[in-house]
A protein has these predicted regions:
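Structural motif
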Residues: 54-58, 90, 186-188
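Cysteine-nucleophile active-site neighborhood
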Residues: 62-136
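N-terminal beta1-alpha1 cap of cysteine-dependent amidohydrolase-like domains
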Residues: 1-81, 195-242
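Pocket-forming structural segment of enzyme catalytic cores
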Residues: 107-177
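Glycine-rich beta-alpha junction loops
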Residues: 9-11, 150-152, 191-193
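A glycine-centered loop/beta-turn motif at secondary-structure junctions
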Residues: 171-209
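Beta-strand-turn-beta hairpins that frame and shape the catalytic cleft
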Residues: 1-3, 140-143, 179-185
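Glycine-rich nucleotide phosphate-binding loop and flanking beta-alpha elements
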Residues: 62-63, 96-98, 152-154, 193-195
Length: 242
C-alpha cells in the first residue's frame, strides 16, 4: 500500500525525541512492504486529512503548545471529520490537551481546544517528572515510559491507560491516563511512547490497516525494542512492589 503520515509541527512539537514515534512507525510499515510518505505540516501550513493514514503530533513546551493550538484549531472540523472516518491518530505529550474543550494555563487564561473530546486541562506551576508503569485494556503487556507534565486533565471517559502502578495520570497519581476513542490515541507518556512500547506500535499498525480495509499481515518485531521494553518493565515493576 501507499500510505501517508501527517506529522504536525515537527519543529515546534518534538520534545523528548517525539519525532521517533513517526520514524519507528514508518520503518515498521516499510518493512511490511508499504510505501510510506511523511508529510511535515509546519505552522500555518495546510493539510489534507482526507487522504491521511496516520496523523501525529508530539510534545512541546507550554508556550509552543499554545502556538500549535492557534493553528491546529483552524483545522478542527477537518480533524474531527478524519477521526469520525477512522483515520488513525496519535497525540503524544501535551499535544493531547489540544483535543479537549479548554486549556487553562498557570496564570488562569483559558484557551479553547478542538472539542474532539469532552475533557478539560488545567496547567499548574508544579511539574511532575517521573517514570510510568501502567496498564491498558488494548493488550496484556504493561505500558512504560515517563511523564513531564504540569496539567490536571478531567472529564476523560475513555482513557488509554486504565490504571497506573507508578506515575501521574490524568487527574493525579496512579489514576487512568491518556485518551482513546476509536482510532484516536493520546497520552502524556514520552519515551518516545511507540519506541518504548512495541505492543502499542502494533496497535497503531493494525488500526492503519483496519482503516484501509486490509488484513494486517504479521508485524515485524524489533528485538532491541522488545528487549528494551522487557528490561524497563521488569525494573519498574520491581520498584512498584517495594
Amino acid at each position: 500500500m501507499e500510505l501517508k503520515i501527517l506529522h504536525f509541527y515537527p519543529d515546534l512539537m518534538s520534545l523528548y525525541g517525539s519525532y521517533a514515534n513517526v520514524s519507528i512507525l514508518k520503518r515498521t510499515l516499510e518493512e511490511m512492504g508499504n510505501t510510506v510518505t511523511v508529510e511535515r505540516v509546519e505552522l500555518g501550513g495546510d493539510a489534507d486529512l482526507t487522504h491521511a493514514d496516520f496523523v501525529y503530533m508530539g510534545a512541546g513546551t507550554e508556550r509552543a503548545q499554545k502556538a500549535a493550538l492557534l493553528y491546529f484549531s483552524k483545522l478542527g472540523d477537518a480533524v474531527k471529520a478524519a477521526a469520525d472516518a477512522g483515520v488513525t491518530m496519535l497525540f503524544a505529550g501535551n499535544s493531547m490537551e489540544l483535543l479537549g474543550k479548554t486549556i487553562t494555563d498557570d496564570a488562569g487564561k483559558v484557551y479553547e481546544g478542538l472539542g474532539l473530546a469532552d475533557f478539560t486541562a488545567v496547567q499548574n506551576k508544579k511539574r511532575f517528572v517521573e517514570d510510568v508503569y501502567g496498564h491498558t485494556d488494548l493488550y496484556e503487556d504493561a505500558v512504560v515510559g515517563f511523564v513531564n507534565r504540569c496539567s490536571v486533565i478531567t472529564g476523560v471517559e475513555t482513557p488509554l491507560l486504565a490504571s497506573m502502578d507508578m506515575g501521574h495520570g490524568n487527574e493525579g497519581p496512579c489514576g487512568p491516563e491518556g485518551y482513546h476513542k476509536g482510532s484516536v490515541f493520546a497520552s502524556q507518556l514520552t519515551g518516545p511512547i511507540l519506541v518504548k512500547n512495541p505492543a502499542l506500535l502494533k496497535v497503531m499498525v493494525q488500526a492503519i490497516y483496519r482503516h484501509r480495509g486490509e488484513t494486517c499481515p504479521e508485524i515485524p518485531v524489533d528485538q532491541y525494542m522488545a528487549q528494551g521494553w522487557a528490561i524497563t518493565a521488569e525494573q519498574l515493576k520491581a520498584r512498584c512492589t517495594k
